[in-house]
Amino acid sequence: MTVSPVALRRKTECKPHPTARYWKKCDVEALFGLPFLELVHQAAEVHRQNFNPREIQLSTLLSIKTGGCPEDCAYCPQSAHHNTNLGKEQMMDVDEIVEKAKIAKSRGASRFCMGAAWRGPKPKDVETVSAIIKAVKGLGMETCGTFGMLEEGMAEDLKEAGLDYYNHNLDTDPDRYNDIIHTRRHEDRMDTLGKVRNAGLKVCCGGIVGMNETRAERAGLIASLANLDPQPESVPINRLVKVEGTPLADAEDLDWTEFVRTIAVARITMPQSYVRLSAGRSNMPEAMQAMCFMAGANSIFYGDKLLTTGNPDEDGDRILMEKLNLYPLQFELEGEVAEVEKASGIKVDY
């Protein structure tokens, strides 16, 4: 199917949140095929229609229970199936987690994300993380949890504890899901996402690119995300971090322009979602990150570690945001410039 750039522009300009819009995989692939600068320009226009392009949401991610996961995800160093020299650790102490959240807030983060290497939590685990969520919410931060597949009633318990977002990624194109993961199905992910929505939680749902997939398969991932109804409030786009001992340790590098295209297509197809630069950012040059922000990314993980892999240091992020005249989402410019600069270390110039 051939779709002209003019027709695509007509579809994306000044459109409301397309809850009734079904994205065919071929239509998404046609977006990927637009001339690079034309695609970035269209995505930037959509972004400006829905967000302040200078605001960046700063989130911090903490692994509260690391390693020993029974799932066999080909990309993950925490899987017990892979020899990555990552030991299994017990759940962190509640006070230690809260202290990490306090530090994150003092450095400008507005959202605190917690991950646990479980296939799914047990009822006693839900009790434990509920206490953690309440404590972090007491600091005035948004909370997000990624704890695996949920049983009936668990999402409601997490919601009652004060959880704002539940992260549950679709990982890759549904058509190649079982090439990457054998211990669960795409349908299992959809089942938990349904439980999360029914409980009234916001959804954080994205995927990983750079796992030897084709462009058509990247389009399939974006289409599967964009066709969630309602669309995810938050969409993390991860660039594979290759870890020795995992099946994807020798994956072919994804060209930087293809990653930027993925960000742009995510922005066009999900205009009101936060699109987050997630894993893999430590290997992205500043110019590449700037292109991603131009293409519609408006959220980053802030801190030197993502679960078990590296992330740009906070000083580097502050410097980059100053260069690009970006500022943290949690503050309004008018009347609160001093607070922005004090908490994040980022000088706001407007």
UniProtKB/Swiss-Prot annotation:
* Residues involved in [2Fe-2S] cluster binding: C113, C144, C204, R276
- Name the UniProt key words of this record, in alphabetical order: 2Fe-2S, 4Fe-4S, Biotin biosynthesis, Iron, Iron-sulfur, Metal-binding, S-adenosyl-L-methionine, Transferase
A biological process (GO) of this protein is: biotin biosynthetic process
The UniProt record lists the Radical SAM core domain at 54-278
Q: What is its EC number?
A: 2.8.1.6
Protein's pathway: Cofactor biosynthesis; biotin biosynthesis; biotin from 7,8-diaminononanoate: step 2/2
Q: Which cysteines are joined by disulfide bonds?
A: none
Q: Tell me which cofactor or cofactors this protein depends on.
A: [4Fe-4S] cluster; [2Fe-2S] cluster
Q: Which Gene3D superfamilies match?
A: Aldolase class I
Q: Which SMART domains match?
A: BATS (SM00876), Elp3 (SM00729)
Q: How is the cofactor bound?
A: Binds 1 [4Fe-4S] cluster. The cluster is coordinated with 3 cysteines and an exchangeable S-adenosyl-L-methionine.
Q: Which HAMAP family match?
A: BioB
Name this polypeptide is given: Biotin synthase
